[in-house]
């Protein structure tokens, strides 16, 4: 369903937008942004030129206008009805940097790919970042959800997060203030992460290269890295592996519409070509149902679902009652 509200929303922001240097796009297709390559339109998409431009935009954005932040699009599923309000997509030019910030320290912009941080660390003999080479996505998302791989989590290397709130005020959050747990932080969802400071330890480059090669080889062997996918679909329940539960429930390779649970790694949902947001979310909820009926375990989404459903194409979330 094509939205027609973007121009109206842009006009409502008044003359203040004339001073904005970033790109403002009404009715922006989200299927060009997400790694799933599916979903509806963003009513208005804003890509700030830099942090000052971001602050200026936030100060003219009315409080009642919804604001949704997306990173590189690797861990989100956008519904077919699109995303009302403003979608904030940080630009690579202003937020994609990675640089040294002192002995064994690295500062990375929120949109910087995780693997670029791993590469910077290796080039400078800084250990502890090899796991980032196996995580698809950007540093802001990794900091937000405490992303991890190969037994290492983001919180183990993170010193502080730099952020801006909805009013345009700047904040710095320490590791402790992030309130980390497994694939979660308690940081306010109103905060927009702009950069992250990390600290590693001295390590030989050859050793780091070997660790990164092992991560890459493992990922390419067991994950559908060349498919349209958002990464791990569900969190691992305590004491269990999500992929194993999905496999035991008979959902490996399960297809709904244009969406499939990967036959290579069944905790990865893939767009086989023409999947809609509805197909993907319906498939995920069906897997949650099948796993619960088999093992009594309720899987939690790791993929974020954003936006609104198309009328008549709503997906009912499974709440753990088999009679639903």
Curated annotation (Swiss-Prot):
Matches recorded under Pfam families: FAD_binding_4, MurB_C
EC number of this enzyme: 1.3.1.98
MF terms (GO), sorted A to Z: FAD binding; UDP-N-acetylmuramate dehydrogenase activity
Reported cofactor(s): FAD
Transmembrane segments: none
Pathway membership: Cell wall biogenesis; peptidoglycan biosynthesis
SUPFAM superfamilies the UniProt entry points to: FAD-binding/transporter-associated domain-like, Uridine diphospho-N-Acetylenolpyruvylglucosamine reductase, MurB, C-terminal domain
Reactions that this protein is recorded to catalyse: UDP-N-acetyl-alpha-D-muramate + NADP(+) = UDP-N-acetyl-3-O-(1-carboxyvinyl)-alpha-D-glucosamine + NADPH + H(+)
One GO location term (cellular component): cytosol
Family membership noted in the UniProt record: Belongs to the MurB family.
Function: Cell wall formation.
Protein name per Swiss-Prot or TrEMBL: UDP-N-acetylenolpyruvoylglucosamine reductase
Phylogenetic classification of the source organism: Bacteria, Pseudomonadati, Pseudomonadota, Alphaproteobacteria, Hyphomicrobiales
């Amino acid at each position: 369903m094509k939205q027609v509200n973007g121009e109206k929303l842009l006009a409502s922001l008044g003359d203040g937008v004339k001073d904005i240097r970033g790109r403002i796009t009404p009715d922006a297709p989200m299927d060009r942004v997400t790694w799933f390559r599916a979903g509806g339109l963003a009513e208005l998409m804003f890509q700030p030129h830099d942090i000052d431009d971001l602050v200026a935009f936030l100060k003219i954005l009315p409080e009642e206008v919804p604001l949704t932040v997306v990173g590189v699009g690797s861990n989100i599923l956008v519904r077919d009805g699109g995303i009302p309000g403003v979608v904030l997509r940080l630009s690579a030019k202003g937020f994609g940097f990675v640089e040294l910030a002192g002995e064994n320290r690295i500062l990375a912009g929120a949109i910087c790919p995780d693997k670029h941080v791993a590469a910077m660390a290796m080039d400078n003999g800084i250990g502890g970042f090899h796991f980032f080479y196996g995580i698809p996505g950007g540093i802001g998302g990794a900091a937000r959800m405490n992303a991890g791989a190969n037994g290492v989590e983001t919180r183990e290397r993170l010193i502080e997060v730099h952020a801006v709130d909805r009013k345009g005020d700047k904040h710095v959050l320490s590791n402790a203030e992030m309130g980390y747990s497994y694939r979660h932080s308690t940081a306010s969802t109103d905060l927009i992460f702009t950069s992250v400071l990390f600290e590693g330890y001295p390590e030989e480059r050859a050793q780091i290269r070997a660790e990164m090669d092992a991560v890459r080889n493992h990922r390419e062997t067991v994950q559908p890295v060349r498919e349209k996918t958002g990464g791990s679909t569900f969190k691992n329940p305590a004491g269990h592996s999500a992929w194993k539960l999905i496999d035991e429930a008979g959902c490996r390779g399960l297809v709904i519409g244009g969406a499939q649970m990967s036959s290579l790694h069944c905790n990865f949902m893939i767009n086989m070509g023409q999947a809609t947001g509805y197909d993907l979310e319906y498939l995920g909820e069906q897997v949650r149902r099948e796993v619960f009926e088999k093992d009594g375990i309720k899987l939690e989404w790791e993929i974020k679902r954003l936006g609104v459903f198309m009328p008549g194409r709503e997906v009912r979330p499974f709440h753990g009652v088999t009679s639903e």
